[in-house]
Structure formats: C-alpha cells, structure tokens
C-alpha cells in the first residue's frame, strides 16, 4: 500500500508552500486504487495527504453502482453531486440527487446508495478521519 501511495504521489503534480498544498487530481487518484480519496488517515503519516481531521473524496460513479446500508460511528459527512443522478436512502427516506443536490449526515445516521441512475461525479467530505468508522448494517436488523 505504501509503495502504491508513493508512486501515486510522484505522479500527482503538487506544490507545497509553508502552510498550503496545491495539486491536480489525476485520473489515477480518481479511478485507481485510492478510489478518489484525496486525503485521510489511511495515507502514510509522512505523506502530504495524511490527515486525521478530514477525509476528502472525488468519485466518478458508474451507472447501476450501489453501496450497502451503513453509517459512520463518529464522523460528520457531507456529499454533493457535481454531475449525473443518484438515488440515496438517508435514514429510511429516499432521495434522487442531481447536480447541486447535497446531503449532510450526523454520526450514526444511516446511508444507502440505492443506485446510480446516470454516471455521476460526487465530492464527499467526512470529518474527522477515523479508522474502522464505517459500520455496515444488516437490512434485517434495520
């Protein structure tokens, strides 16, 4: 994993200032093994992308993509749809999200990506970034 991240870092053009980082999100970050995650606790501590306070992700989701019902134990989550259409279930309520639509979830609120209707690009922010924070929910327990 660390070798893969090092290789991605070398391919990602970034400029590091004293108190900032400017970069370009490459296709390898979005579509590669990091699956769009730009920063978070999962990057090695010495990486410019290692953060414990926040996770940021840009993802392109293909048509018919789904994700199981889950919640985040300790993290606030914000997601905005930049393009396309996606159906989400949030705490049991169904929502069709289109460009400009967003949701904000408090820790413990359940989310379920029902289906990507049109290929979509999303920006997700979760804070803080905590290992083992995603808890899967068995539908029969819901």
Name what the model sees in each region.
Residues 1-53, 68, 138-142:
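A short, N-terminal "cap"/entry segment at the start of jelly-roll beta-barrel domains
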Residues 40-45, 55-73, 107:
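Conserved short histidine dyad/triad with adjacent acidic residue
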Residues 52, 107-133:
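Ligand-binding loop in jelly-roll beta-barrel domains
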Residues 52-54, 61-65, 85, 128-130:
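Short, charged/polar surface micro-motifs in flexible loops or helix N-caps
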Residues 60-62, 71-87, 125:
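Short, conserved beta-strand element in jelly-roll/cupin
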Residues 82-83, 99, 118:
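A cytosolic small-molecule/anion-sensing beta-strand core signal
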Residues 92-108:
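Short acidic-glycine-tyrosine-enriched beta hairpin
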